[in-house]
């Protein structure tokens, strides 16, 4: 089996096999082929010389060469760089030894070297090579490499110490981190508490503001309600006053209507009575000539002229008209009195009493100075014949000379017979 056919298979810790370049053993390049015996002897000599104890240096040698190789103490190398150099040298040597062994003896050899970096170096003959190339062999190698190391081994002790130191550092770092986290949490809690307090204060301030606004609104609403109630009460009072005024006005109107109705009834009754009296007078009246004869007789007895009597009568009539105008309040009475006065100016009128056509005439005639007789207003006896009261005692009595003391008309405007 030639050296060129041998290949190194590298398996990383993840289970992937890395195929590296074959290791090239440092063999002597000579044209003559070495026999297995010669090569074996030479290798044995080299091993003996490499593993043997170093001989004491001879003082007689003057060439300055070393007497032998320095013996290396077989123990774990702490220096990582030295350990890497030693691994590379020893790995090459052992690979060469495995090749020589398989070649010289014809035995099946399987060599596997795993570095601390996770690389795996293998040497296998043809029959044992499937253990490395097949997935089953790869998985087996990977499972073996994944098993924990022996704690009694020096490398494991150093690794444990390193791991312990690392663990301590990690624990310290974790503690620091935890302390920092606690401090951060405390700060966050304090900030949260401060924020909560601020929020509570803000909420309280907002609630107080809202309560104040609500109180102000309630006060405003109460004031508005009171104003509305006052306005409503005022309106109700005004309405009640208006209703009372309307009721009073209605009552007054009713009273006025009732009074008017009563007045109308009284006037109607008085008119009916007056009409009845006029009818009775017309039926039982005296001729006008009687009154003319009586007046002329009285004037003759008094010794006055007719002209003077007429003037006096006219003056008395005018005075009576003025008195009637002052006593009467309605225009209808004035018009009727004027009509009566105009009728009196006609001395030759022989008609009877003029019937009143206006129903609104004041029938309660209260002037005691004048009263109707015939077709004109005659003055009272006392005012008309006051000068002849003493001289006419021996004259015969006339129809106009009765009841001088009362100065009023007889009942039903009736005169005693002449």
UniProtKB/Swiss-Prot annotation:
Molecular function per GO: DNA-binding transcription factor activity; DNA-binding transcription factor activity, RNA polymerase II-specific; protein dimerization activity; RNA polymerase II cis-regulatory region sequence-specific DNA binding
Domain MADS-box intervals: 67-127
Keyword Transcription regulation found: yes
Disulfide bonds: none
Composition bias type Low complexity, residue spans: 22-39, 51-61, 150-170, 306-351, 388-399
SMART domains xrefs: MADS
InterPro entries: MADS-box/MEF2_TF (IPR050142), SRF-like_MADS-box (IPR033897), TF_MADSbox (IPR002100), TF_MADSbox_sf (IPR036879)
Keyword terms of this UniProt record: DNA-binding, Nucleus, Transcription, Transcription regulation
Region (Disordered): 14-67, 144-170, 301-351, 388-418
Compositionally biased spans, kind Polar residues: 400-418
Cell compartment(s), UniProt: Nucleus
Example GO biological process: phototaxis
Disruption phenotype: Cells have an abnormal spore morphology and show a greatly reduced spore viability. No defects in the overall morphology of the structures were observed during development, except for a delay of 3-4 hours in culmination. Prestalk gene expression is normal. Expression of the prespore marker cotB is unaffected whereas expression of the spore gene spiA is greatly reduced. Mutant spore show no formation of mature actin rods. The spore outer layer gets wavier as the spore ages and suffers a progressive degradation.
Cellular component GO terms held in the UniProt record: nucleus
Induction / repression: Induced by the protein kinase A (PKA) which is activated during culmination. This leads to the expression of srfA in prespore cells.
Function summary: Required for proper slug migration, spore differentiation and stalk differentiation (under nonbuffered conditions). Could be involved in late events of spore maturation necessary for spore stability.
Protein's recorded name: Serum response factor homolog A
Encoding gene (name): srfA
